[in-house]
UniProtKB/Swiss-Prot annotation:
Identification of the protein by name: Unique cartilage matrix-associated protein
Biological process terms in GO annotation: embryonic skeletal system development; regulation of osteoblast differentiation
Pfam families: UCMA
Family: Belongs to the UCMA family.
Organism annotation: Danio rerio (Zebrafish)
Gene expressing this chain: ucma
One GO term describing the cellular component: extracellular matrix
Length: 135
């Protein structure tokens, strides 16, 4: 029970301080703020007349202007160029990889052939097996 009295007294002091000072008015929004939005809200929302004419300016079936057609064509061409460059780069990477693999395979084959020749060498040049004279 001893802690309830100081807690109650503290709550009353805080409540009286809030009601006496004008700083509490800033937490409440005024009607004029809603009428005149400022900052980010002004960028998001537009007047009703502009919003109505926004969709009237160009409907879905309206013909595109030449500038719009040219801009879309430039975007398409740029995308095609990026795609072409990407595929060319991938093809070059694969060709380099395949060439290195073939070179390594050729090297392994050459080494194995040399080892086989050294193992089967009989002292004759060319080797006796390949230089037989038929009688």
């Amino acid at each position: 029970m001893s802690w309830t009295q100081p807690a109650l007294l503290t709550c009353l002091l805080v409540l009286s301080a809030i009601t006496l000072f004008d700083g509490a008015d800033s937490a409440v929004s005024d009607k004029r703020d809603a009428v005149n939005p400022q900052g980010a809200l002004r960028k998001i929302f537009m007047p009703e007349a502009d919003a109505a004419s926004f969709f009237k300016r160009r409907s879905r079936r309206a013909v595109k202007t030449q500038d719009e057609i040219n801009a879309e064509q430039r975007q398409r061409l740029a995308a095609d160029e990026r795609r072409r460059e990407y595929h060319e780069e991938q093809r070059n990477k694969y060709e380099n990889y395949a060439e290195e693999e073939n070179d390594e395979q050729d090297e392994r084959t050459r080494e194995k052939t040399e080892q086989w020749r050294e193992f089967h060498y009989d002292g004759l040049d060319p080797s006796y097996e390949y230089n037989r004279h038929t009688i």
